[in-house]
Each structure stands twice: as C-alpha cells, then as structure tokens.
Amino acid sequence: MSATHETRRRGFVREILGRSDYAIISELIEPGSRVLDLGCGDGELLGWLAANKQVEGRGIEIDGPRVQRAIARGLTVYQGDIDAGLTDYPDGSFDYVILSQTLQETRRPLNVIQEMLRVGRHAIVTFPNYGHWSVRLSLLTSGRAPRTRCLPYSWFDSPNILSLIHI
C-alpha cells in the first residue's frame, strides 16, 4: 500500500470515528482477531472494528449509560471497574487488549497494564494529546490546564490525584 493511500485511509478512519488514535489502532488490529476494549465508552471503536475488521469484540466500561448505549449497538459490553482486575478472563484470552485514552482515568495503572498483558497477546495503550495546539493555547491564555472532552478533569480532581488523597 502506498504512503499516499495509507494517509488517505487513516484520514478516512479518523473522519468517520473522529479520533486519530482510533485510526492508528484500527491499522494495528488484524481482521478476525479477538479484541477486548477496556474503558470502551459507548462502543464506538469496538463497533467499527467489528463491522470493518470482523473482530470478535468485548468491552468493559464503568459508566452504566455508556454500557447501555454499547449494548443497544449490538455489542458485548460489560459494566465493570478495570482497576479491580480482569479476573473473569484466563491468560491469553484475547489477541489484542485496547486501552484508549483511559489509563489516566485509572487508580492502579500498573495493575491495569499487567492485567492487559496477562489476558492479551498484544496491548495497545493510547493517551490524550496533552501537547495539542488547542491545549497549549488554552494553557497559555488562561494559565490553567484546560478541561476538554478528552481531558474532563481539572488537574486537582483527576482520578489518579484523588486516589492519592484516599490512601
């Protein structure tokens, strides 16, 4: 596949799903794979992978309304807290385990990553782009870390900071 074609395809996936990390993740996933999406939200990525890569997908999401929306899409999504571990899944249950822009929401990130590596052959972790120009501009003009759709917390009330307070 030519670089130009690949760039166009990635742009198309980004346009459809609205996030550049989804485009990159979709390139990494082999068709027909077994995929676990941790913190899957309403299943947008999982649904796209099922439709376009024919993956056998499952998701775990902590937010009840998002779980309901994912299930309404016909996806297999369970409500659960990934900080509690993935004890329901034996070693090597999945080809890919995805943690997309979710690690910063966890209270036990090392445990979450260890569990990903235990249940999956491959782990894919993405992060919000804290260096994006819009984030930098907001920081410059307001003097405060911005709150966005991908970064919904102030620095002092993020889950990892709050977990330190409750030690």
Predicted regions located by residue number:
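Conserved class I S-adenosyl-L-methionine
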Residues: 33-41, 125-148
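Conserved alpha-helix/loop element of class I SAM-dependent methyltransferases that forms part
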Residues: 16-32
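A short SAM/SAH-binding and catalytic strip from SAM-dependent methyltransferases
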Residues: 96-107
